[in-house]
């Protein structure tokens, strides 16, 4: 899980999800998991 000020899709399979006001990226590739914070 990467925590970044700005999250971007890293590949076609990345999805942007908002959970409790937090923007997250979920993907098949575990390296692409990100959270904004």
Swiss-Prot record:
<dbReference type="InterPro" id="IPR000473">
    <property type="entry name" value="Ribosomal_bL36"/>
</dbReference>
<dbReference type="InterPro" id="IPR035977">
    <property type="entry name" value="Ribosomal_bL36_sp"/>
</dbReference>
<comment type="similarity">
    <text>Belongs to the bacterial ribosomal protein bL36 family.</text>
</comment>
<dbReference type="GO" id="GO:0005737">
    <property type="term" value="C:cytoplasm"/>
</dbReference>
<dbReference type="GO" id="GO:0003735">
    <property type="term" value="F:structural constituent of ribosome"/>
</dbReference>
<dbReference type="GO" id="GO:0006412">
    <property type="term" value="P:translation"/>
</dbReference>
<keyword id="KW-0687">Ribonucleoprotein</keyword>
<dbReference type="Pfam" id="PF00444">
    <property type="entry name" value="Ribosomal_L36"/>
</dbReference>
<dbReference type="GO" id="GO:1990904">
    <property type="term" value="C:ribonucleoprotein complex"/>
</dbReference>
<protein>
    <recommendedName>
        <fullName>Large ribosomal subunit protein bL36</fullName>
    </recommendedName>
</protein>
<keyword id="KW-0689">Ribosomal protein</keyword>
<dbReference type="GO" id="GO:0005840">
    <property type="term" value="C:ribosome"/>
</dbReference>
């Amino acid at each position: 899980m990467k925590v970044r000020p700005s999250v971007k899709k890293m590949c076609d399979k990345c999805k942007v999800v908002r959970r409790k006001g937090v923007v997250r990226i979920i993907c098949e590739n575990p390296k692409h998991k990100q959270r904004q914070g």
